[in-house]
């Protein structure tokens, strides 16, 4: 659902609530005013699709208006929750009869898993597919010449001998997604997974709201029941709860050919409704001061100040996205449904010169004083310009990475062949925790960083539309990770390897003994020279197969086994 209009979200936050007479006159003061509101308990963490996210959008619209811009909203629909209902059925017919003679009990005996269709039902004969393993490399095919088209596939999880040999090469083809793909290629109309042994960890019954669903019912059955040679009935009835989320944008039209997009996401993770938190305690508001009230405040500051003659070589589009924390939903929707003034006659989004994404700018470390600019490899002009930027190195040092991909909204534009730069002050221990509060923001560090942003624009003013370059790790953004290690990379680290900037409680890294400051040099079979290599290595791991991580800790090189079970 798409709707572009003057923002009317049904709230009563009038302009009088933010009277011009109370506006701070200094940049750090204006940044503090914005962050103090957006990261207040009143907004309850700005969860995408929540009333408080709408309040955030309304505040941003009001600030655009005060900057003499016309705010627009773009509303899009998100899935908040998927929940199996009591209309789900798993049952067995008597041989030769249509009547279901045994019904399994939902959540006691079975449940749908995330990949299952929301609505499909089927009644069919079943076939025992064993472990459902197919590997050309290992010369194994559990299906052989058997035709399972039109049948329900019953498949054991894992692989044979898994308890005794967790490092078997069979683990490479034993994950659930691979098994599903293999059985659907063969025409199965339903899938039932069962445990190979009692202690095997079952797949989660918590349905992922953003999982790509398939057009067949897919269940896990936790009973050691032997199905008779009779038809099985499967009916997947999953209720889907939806809500509206809000992108907000405003356009400064300087009547030029090209437009610079300056963006930030305004959503955060609420009270951890979607389990995105790194915090393991009882529910608390995650205010998201750095992530990303800081980015929104910086974007609003640019909307107020990019007015002078030296900035009029381009038009500007200021955008606050929602749904970033749920998978870049808002920016993906925006590039698919962009305002027509961004298109030229030959290319969708063709009038966009480049994109500056501001995500987590509020925690410039007072010791390191590092500002990271990600994506500078997406145009040859960026590195040339950055080399000419002047900063007091006692106040701010600039480090760069080349990749246009990453877990933030600039990636959505990069994948449309648009140059991007991501302004980032670095990871910290408060990331995705309730402790990411306004009191910890470094406002002078933010102001210094915005001076860099302004210089970047001016230095590129005479170059016209910047050429685009695809970075070498272009496929990395499409990697689907089956596991998480639970570490935060230190993006300011320029040495060989990937230095850990934080370790999440209860995750595999912590359980294995990895520590902040460790430098990962090898993950599984992949040598790690930087964050990009680490991501490639992570994408090759599966939950069923432990791996080794080689690290440098002080003067020692250690090999540490890690399990994902």
For each predicted feature, which ranges?
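Soluble metallo-hydrolase cores and metallopeptidase-like ectodomains found primarily
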Residues: 23, 95, 109-141, 145, ...
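His/Asp/Glu-rich mid-to-C-terminal helical/loop segments that flank catalytic regions of hydrolases
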Residues: 297, 304, 308, 429-475
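Conserved PDZ fold ligand-binding element
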Residues: 511-530
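Metal-dependent peptidase/peptidase-like ectodomains
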Residues: 119, 255, 311, 321-422, ...
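PDZ/PDZ-like groove recognition
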Residues: 472-516
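PDZ-domain C-terminal substructure recognizer with occasional recognition of PDZ-binding tails
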Residues: 521, 536-565
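N-terminal capping segment at the start of a domain
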Residues: 26-51, 67, 72-75, 198-199, ...
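Noncatalytic luminal/extracellular "stalk/propeptide" segments of secretory-pathway proteins
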Residues: 33, 41-164
């Amino acid at each position: 659902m798409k709707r572009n209009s003057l923002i009317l979200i049904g709230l009563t936050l009038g302009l009088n609530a933010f009277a011009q007479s109370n506006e701070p006159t200094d940049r750090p003061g204006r940044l503090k005013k914005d962050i103090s509101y957006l990261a207040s308990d009143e907004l309850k963490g700005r969860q995408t699709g929540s009333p408080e996210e709408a309040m955030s959008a309304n505040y941003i619209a009001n600030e655009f208006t005060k900057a003499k811009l016309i705010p627009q909203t773009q509303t899009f629909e998100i899935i908040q929750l998927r929940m199996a209902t009591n209309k789900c059925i798993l049952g067995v017919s008597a041989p030769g009869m249509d009547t279901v003679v045994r019904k399994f009990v939902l959540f006691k005996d079975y449940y749908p898993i995330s990949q299952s269709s929301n609505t499909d039902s089927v009644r069919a004969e079943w076939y025992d597919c064993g472990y459902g393993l197919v590997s050309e490399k290992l010369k194994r095919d559990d299906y052989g010449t058997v035709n399972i088209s039109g049948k329900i596939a019953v498949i054991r999880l894992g692989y044979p001998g898994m308890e005794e040999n967790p490092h078997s090469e069979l683990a490479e083809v034993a994950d659930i997604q691979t098994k599903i793909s293999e059985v659907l290629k063969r025409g199965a109309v339903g899938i039932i997974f069962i445990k190979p042994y009692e202690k095997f960890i079952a797949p989660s019954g918590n349905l992922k709201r953003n999982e790509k669903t398939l057009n067949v019912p897919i269940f896990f059955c936790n009973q050691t029941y032997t199905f008779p040679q009779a038809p099985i009935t499967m009916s997947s009835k999953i209720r889907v709860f939806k809500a509206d989320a809000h992108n907000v944008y405003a356009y400064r039209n300087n009547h030029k050919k090209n437009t610079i997009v300056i963006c930030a996401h305004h959503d955060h993770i609420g009270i951890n409704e979607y389990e995105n938190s790194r915090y393991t305690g009882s529910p608390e508001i995650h205010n998201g001061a750095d992530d990303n009230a800081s980015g929104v405040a910086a974007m609003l500051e640019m909307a107020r100040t990019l007015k002078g003659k030296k900035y009029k070589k381009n038009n500007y589009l200021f955008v606050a996205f929602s749904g970033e924390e749920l998978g870049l939903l808002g920016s993906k929707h925006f590039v698919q449904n962009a305002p027509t003034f961004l298109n030229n006659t030959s290319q969708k989004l063709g009038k966009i010169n480049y994109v500056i994404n501001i995500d987590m700018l509020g925690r410039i470390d007072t010791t390191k004083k590092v500002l990271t600019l990600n994506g500078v490899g997406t145009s040859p002009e960026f590195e040339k310009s950055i080399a000419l930027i002047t900063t007091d190195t006692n106040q701010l040092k600039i480090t760069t990475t080349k990749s246009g991909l990453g877990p933030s909204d600039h990636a959505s534009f990069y994948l449309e062949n648009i140059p991007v730069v991501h302004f980032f002050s670095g990871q910290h221990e408060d990331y995705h925790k309730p402790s990411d509060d306004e009191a910890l923001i470094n406002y002078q560090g933010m102001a210094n960083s915005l001076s860099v942003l302004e210089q970047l624009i001016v230095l590129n003013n005479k170059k016209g539309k910047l050429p685009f370059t695809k970075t070498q790790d272009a496929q990395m953004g499409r990697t689907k990770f089956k596991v998480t290690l639970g570490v935060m990379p230190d993006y300011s680290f320029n040495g060989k390897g990937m230095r850990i900037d934080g370790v999440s409680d209860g995750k595999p890294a912590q359980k294995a003994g990895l520590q902040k400051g460790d430098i990962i040099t090898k993950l599984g079979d992949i040598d790690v020279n930087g964050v990009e290599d680490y991501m490639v290595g992570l994408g090759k791991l599966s939950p069923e197969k432990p791996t080794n991580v080689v690290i440098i800790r002080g003067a020692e090189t250690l090999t540490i086994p890690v399990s994902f079970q």
